[in-house]
Amino acid sequence: MADELLVGTVAAAEQQPGARAPALLLTLDLGTYGTAQAVLPGQHDPDDIRDTQLVCRREDDGAIVVAAHSHGKGMVPLRPDVEVEPGTLVS
């Protein structure tokens, strides 16, 4: 089912060329839900994001990374405190 919050592991992260503002294009491993692409806006180093886990909202056409907007730090993605299986639902 789409529109669920779940944990995805970042399998790939690269700068999104041609974007109006800095952003990364992410490929997320969602476990039994497969993979999805998502955009993470802001100044993020792809090497710091790759192989980490992020909370995202799964949609029919991809995923949206759940993040908090901090005036001092920009977009801060939400992450689990401990590693869990990719695709773990957030409740």
Model-derived features: where do they sit?
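Phosphate-backbone binding interfaces of nucleic-acid-interacting proteins
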Residues: 1-91
